Amino acid sequence: MASRQDRREARAEADARRAAEEIARARDERVMQAEVDARSAADEIARARADRGAATMGADTAHHAAGGGGILESVQEGAKSFVSAVGRTFGGARDTAAEKTSQTADATRDKLGEYKDYTADKARETNDSVARKTNETADASRDKLGEYKDYTADKTRETKDAVAQKASDASEATKNKLGEYKDALARKTRDAKDTTAQKATEFKDGVKATAQETRDATADTARKAKDATKDTTQTAADKARETAATHDDATDKGQGQGLLGALGNVTGAIKEKLTVSPAATQEHLGGGEERAVKERAAEKAASVYFEEKDRLTRERAAERVDKCVEKCVEGCPDATCAHRHGKM
């Protein structure tokens, strides 16, 4: 705003300077024209005076050179009269020219004085007008500047108030949103905790029930496996005894199937005990633990079978040797007799 006022004042000063220069140029032109007119009039006066002086000097010379008497004197008198007339004529012209020159000079001085007064008045009026315009412009600028300052201050206050109101509203909204968010978060946290606790309790109860069921099933499976193992072992022992008895009878009669047949019978018995046949197809008991139990039962049954077989074999061999010794003196003709091979 200050720069705008400065520009306006500078323009006003420039306009005032241009007006003063125009006035000075006009005054100089008029003064120069008056001076030219005065010089022309002076030149006319000087020429008229020179002409008149030359005529007077010619008349005096003619008067002194002429002699007296007669026609010559008459001529001289006529010439003198003519010169006098000319002199009077030129004197009137000179007076008229001098008067005209004086009048012209006076008129020129008057015009110049009037022009100077006019120029001074115009300059004063121009200066007064410029000063008045400058003052009015300065006053208007100050008023505008004051109004603009007041307007700017009002707008600034309004803007500050609006910004403060917006900030307060935003702060309140943020606080409300934050409170709502905190409440929602706390509610969600409580719900999550309750759900987690409930899920944990349910999971714990489920795990406990599952563990109990697993323990019960394991115990039941172990009992079943133990019973099955016991039955299998007993059955294997019975089969072993039956097989041994059958083998002995077959050996005595020469109709037995041998050790491989007996082993196959015992193996079939163990396999039959370790499988369940509710229908036409065999269904093995499931589960890794059950399978391991069945394998251990089969191994134990096989061990019992082989132990029982070895015991029975040793008993039967001892019985055969005793029978062989009782029947023959030099030795048993049977190729399996132990004492024929130096084993006695």
UniProtKB/Swiss-Prot annotation:
Keywords: Coiled coil, Nucleus, Stress response. Involved in abiotic stress responses. May function as chaperone and contribute to prevent the formation of damaging protein aggregates. The lineage of its organism: Eukaryota, Viridiplantae, Streptophyta, Embryophyta, Tracheophyta. GO terms for cellular component: nucleus. It is found in: Nucleus. It comes from Oryza sativa subsp. japonica (Rice). Expressed in embryos. The keyword Lipid metabolism does not apply. Gene3D superfamilies: 6.10.140.1430. This is Late embryogenesis abundant protein 17. It comes from the Eukaryota.
